[in-house]
Amino acid sequence: MTTPQYRQVPAQVDLPALEHAVLDFWREQKIFAKSLEQSEGRPEWVFYEGPPTANGMPGAHHIEARVFKDVFPRFRTMRGYHVGRKAGWDCHGLPVELAVEKELGFSGKQDIEAYGIAEFNAKCRESVTRHTDAFEELTTRMGYWADLQDPYRTMDPEYIESVWWSLKEIFNKGLLVQDHRVAPWCPRCGTGLSDHELAQGYETVVDPSVYVRFPLTSGPLAGEAALVVWTTTPWTLVSNTAVAAHPDVTYVVATDGEEKLVVAEPLLAKALGEGWETTGQSFTGAEMERWTYQRPFELVEFPEPAHYVVNADYVTTEDGTGLVHQSPAFGEDDLKVCRAYGLPVVNPVRPDGTFEEDVPLVGGVFFKKADEKLTEDLETRGLLFKHIPYEHSYPHCWRCHTALLYYAQPSWYIRTTAIKDRLLQENEKTNWFPDAVKHGRYGDWLNNNIDWALSRNRYWGTPLPIWRCAEDHLTVVGSRAELTELSGTDQSSLDPHRPFIDDVTFTCAQEGCSLEAVRVPEVIDAWYDSGSMPFAQWGYPYKNKELFESRYPAQFISEAIDQTRGWFYTLMAVGTLVFDKSSYENVVCLGHILAEDGRKMSKHLGNILQPIPLMDQHGADAVRWFMAAGGSPWAARRVGHGTIQEVVRKTLLTYWNTVAFQALYARTTGWAPSEADPAPADRPVLDRWLLSELHALTDQVTQALDAYDTQRAGKLLSAFVDDLSNWYVRRSRRRFWQGDKAALRTLHEVVETVTKLMAPLTPFITERVWQDLVVPVTPGAPESVHLSSWPEADLTAIDPELSKQMVLVRRLVELGRATRAESGVKTRQPLSRALIAVAGFDTLSPELHSQITEELNVASLASLSEVGGSLVDTTAKANFRALGKRFGKRVQDVAKAVAAADAAALSLALREGTASVEVDGETVTLAPDEVIITETPREGWSVASDSGATVALDLELTEELRRAGLARDAIRLIQEARKNSGLDVADRIALRWTATDPATIAALTDHSGLISDEVLATDFAQGEADDSYGAPFTDEGLSLVFRLRKQ
């Protein structure tokens, strides 16, 4: 029976090529399907996929969210859960319509209706599936496991029926209403927008800021003074209806000697500037109520009396003049105030944003372009007090970037304000990552919640399922089956989109009414579609009832931070409206992806990174690791080739090199795991330390991923892989050469566990390692790492004391290396001894001592106390920065005490922990960071100290030490020659050498056994080589020439 063996692992790895091979393996072996089948019956861990719209090509930012949406389902699957991963597509909405309009060369709704709604919607349907292949390619290439074969689509009839059902539920609760309100309106798209859409489209603009005189025509100041009103929207002055004043604010009359103006007292200087003084007259806003004034423009007719001062509590004295122009057709607060006074609502602006043609001066002009003409007219008539350009943030359409106007119109609203308290309660139950979003960005959003403007005057969307008769009786339909019953005709195959749904009528369902009911013309906000996906993806409640109920709410969702006002909000709002419970429990908010130069990625700047080429250059694992662990996931991050290459170099290649090292020496020595391998307790201290660190790592990484902290998990893994390679493997290299079973078994166990821990983050490289190092030598091993179980940390196997001691060992090694470098004595040159002074040195075992002596290449270690203070001259002085925080003004007194103290005694005390000095009769305790100790080595010694630790190297070289150093130089040269000759690490060699320097001859002669062992020479002799040996290698420094051949 042959011994099982690792597969051969190449020293160099091509990550993209490796990943394509792994993709083939997953596909051929149906690994994703097996992971779902294997976990059937386990507890559900529910994840919701936020649906993208596939009417455009995917970008680098699509990778980011997909990384997190893959990491945690993989992690939870390995932890023993069943994690369904249904993919989805967002199909409806204004972005889709605008893209199709652009393709067809349309300029607005009139072109769509001339073309035909059915034909236009057919184009939209085709558009949203145009790039699904590209999205699926991205999803597959990056290793994001999702069910792409059975996705939900928001345009499918069953999905729409579920949405209808939910709207009927909301209507029956009295929360879906039609109202005439001022709401954001896009004149280009001809539709209203919801508050969360509005939040996504602010742009910085410069508008005219005008201060306008409104001459008073009644009250005590009639004919002699004017109100001064400030606005940044001069175009709304055409329909000015009133001026609002706060009832409790004092308004003063000011004069410059020529005219009198009325402004709020706190804003006198700010609004009017220098040269204005009060006349002594003042009035409260309440006293000014119903004073009439001359309106700024008489371009439109008013059906009822208007144009007087009204009182409003929302008026402030922070900006402007304290007097606010009211135009109720274009302002929500204005509408409320004017309604309370019974004032008319006059709207001279058409839905396309242009003034009615019969409006003098600005007829047919787009509202924003009317500002200039109107301002000039005010100035000509002497009503313009001053005009200042004003830079501010103004709402624009989040898709077409047209300036919005607030527009009074009838729309359908969901009364989310009625469930505000429930939303806040659900938010309290939700875990946000980062936590600051909970009561910050998202909490503020909920606290300022306004009713959801649901309806859209558009075409490609879920039709609002409300039918109305001429008597305004409303019937809300929840399914096509219900529509069949109401209409008396079979609607089971009906496409529920416009215009087909518009053709369905029925007799009003209101008892006693026989009028025809016709569907209202609007469609709904596409954000409601995506917010309904938890139940609509299953066609609930008409099918999959138990399935949905077992998968609501989600344990986890993740998208970019801007979704706090998008999908995160609509998911919570719809869930709470319909089920009185939020749709999710944990949400990870991701920062935006920027170009390497810190700017936003855009075609215009030419700094877009295409996702597939990016992964084919660096590897998907490298991109995934960067996204998950290359910085705070919730902060904006710069992505570029350089940053990703650093990830590959620092972590992934180090991991791979360690795996290749293990495979090489296990195959070379014929080792495979067996029961004959030493038990952990019987292995050397370095093995025991590594296994202790491994269990600690497992515990810490598990905790980090449980807390959705991929950055911390990545840092832990990266640091461990670095320690594994640059400390454990390097320190144990000779043991691996010798086929040491304890070392090989230890590294095997560590690689297997680390591979599992890294698998959710880097699924490709870990799969390859699993196939190469685990499956071949482990009977019954799962065929994929992604079918394996998450490792369990054995907390009893963690040795905190050993960990602490190894930290000390490595600290002393670093100090020793530093002082060697400073002395100029190379590491290959053996030294006789190192003296150590540090707290805890006496607790180190002989095994740990040997780690230090071998690393520092010294023959022995001893405590510095054995030779007293003769090695260094010691000085001590105060660290003012550290002491100043504690002692403030007394720091000078403490500094003098430190300077007067015995510096050597202070140094010794600080190594043990703390030191003390007398200051004005008081004993003051000092910490190591509060005193700067300087130790100057005496001749023949090299000394380094840091934070209470000192390493002193004896630099005196005997002839024996010099010869040993030369022997090590020769070993290095021969190892390089072996490598350059193309020999395998296990190949034995014969070597012939000659030298002219007596020191070199003596060194190679005295240390021939050591050299032979190190370079695997079975025949090592001085003398000329025959022609069977290779070309000569020469080193002038050693005056050495040698030739070698494979045995």
Swiss-Prot record:
Record bears the keyword Ubl conjugation: no
Superkingdom per UniProt: Bacteria
Short sequence motif named 'HIGH' region, residue ranges: 52-62
Subcellular location, principal: cytoplasm
Protein name as catalogued: Isoleucine--tRNA ligase
Domain notes: IleRS has two distinct active sites: one for aminoacylation and one for editing. The misactivated valine is translocated from the active site to the editing site, which sterically excludes the correctly activated isoleucine. The single editing site contains two valyl binding pockets, one specific for each substrate (Val-AMP or Val-tRNA(Ile)).
Role description: Catalyzes the attachment of isoleucine to tRNA(Ile). As IleRS can inadvertently accommodate and process structurally similar amino acids such as valine, to avoid such errors it has two additional distinct tRNA(Ile)-dependent editing activities. One activity is designated as 'pretransfer' editing and involves the hydrolysis of activated Val-AMP. The other activity is designated 'posttransfer' editing and involves deacylation of mischarged Val-tRNA(Ile).
Subunit relationships: Monomer.
Cellular component, GO, one term: cytoplasm
Cofactor needs: Zn(2+)
Family: Belongs to the class-I aminoacyl-tRNA synthetase family. IleS type 2 subfamily.
Class in the EC hierarchy, top level: ligase
Keyword entries, A-Z: Aminoacyl-tRNA synthetase, ATP-binding, Cytoplasm, Ligase, Metal-binding, Nucleotide-binding, Protein biosynthesis, Zinc
Residue numbers binding ATP: 603
SUPFAM superfamilies, per database record: Anticodon-binding domain of a subclass of class I aminoacyl-tRNA synthetases, Nucleotidylyl transferase, ValRS/IleRS/LeuRS editing domain
UniProt xrefs under NCBIfam families: ileS
PANTHER family for this protein: ISOLEUCINE--TRNA LIGASE, CYTOPLASMIC, SOLEUCYL-TRNA SYNTHETASE
Short sequence motif named 'KMSKS' region, residue ranges: 600-604
GO molecular function: aminoacyl-tRNA deacylase activity; ATP binding; isoleucine-tRNA ligase activity; tRNA binding; zinc ion binding
Subcellular location: Cytoplasm
One biological process term in Gene Ontology: isoleucyl-tRNA aminoacylation
Catalysed conversion reaction: tRNA(Ile) + L-isoleucine + ATP = L-isoleucyl-tRNA(Ile) + AMP + diphosphate
EC number: 6.1.1.5
Gene source species: Streptomyces coelicolor (strain ATCC BAA-471 / A3(2) / M145)
